[in-house]
Amino acid sequence: MDRYLLTATLRRDGSSRFSENNRWGLFPSAALAWTISNEPFMKATENVLSKLKLRLGYGVTGQQEIGDYQYITSYSFSTNPNTTYLGTTLLKPNGYSPDLKWEQTTTYNVAIDFGFLNNRINGSIEYYQKHTKDLLNTISAAAGTNFINLITANVGKMKNKGVEANVNAIAIQSKDFTWEVGYNITWNDSKITKLTTTFNPDYQGIDAGTNQKHQVGEMPGTFYLYQQVYDENGKPIQNAFVDRNNDGQI
């Protein structure tokens, strides 16, 4: 019976959303599995422990979810009625980022698959880490360096880690009827580790919606709100907020 399994792939993907110098990305992956329950020394436990497998995985994926033609200079007709010249609509230059390239996520995972009583009870536990670099991000462009003040660029890093577990059981199994129950649980922690090309402790992050920001050291889309002040009975005091840096301003 199979005891050792190895799978490896190598992808080379191209996207017309990047220039010729950065168009192609190389994305490897590999998976290794050891079916421990098929080892001769596990023979004595096969009536109870019907499956036990250790899995290891590694892979790199690429993301290119941005608009088209952002790496080249282009012009478009202005739709602003104030940007006309003698009744003629003007052409305006659009912002561009010639050095755009693939955003890459490297994933590592280790997992255990198990089964008891001829797999009537089975499940798995998996731990993973994901490291993303060259985040495709919207950042401010310095005055005079581009045609617009916000451009798309590869800036930033992010880390994810988590645990996923599931267990399934065949409660009833007959010729005409099978009842299977299952339970799963997931824990994930995401943290942005970099958002600028150089370290800048004063950088305030990127707006991600109403009262939300992408900020280094926090989860993506973290809500930034005023800290409420409560009275001695635990009830919120209207329009009273904590002055966190004691500068006399909220």
Model region roles, listed by residue range:
Residues M1-E218, F223:
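Extracellular/periplasmic, surface-exposed regions of secreted and cell-surface proteins
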Residues A240-R244:
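Calcium-binding motifs, dominated by EF-hand helix-loop-helix domains
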Residues D247:
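Acidic carboxylate motifs that coordinate Ca2+ or other divalent cations, activating on Asp/Glu
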Residues F223-Y230:
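Disulfide-bonded cysteine-rich modules in secreted/extracellular proteins
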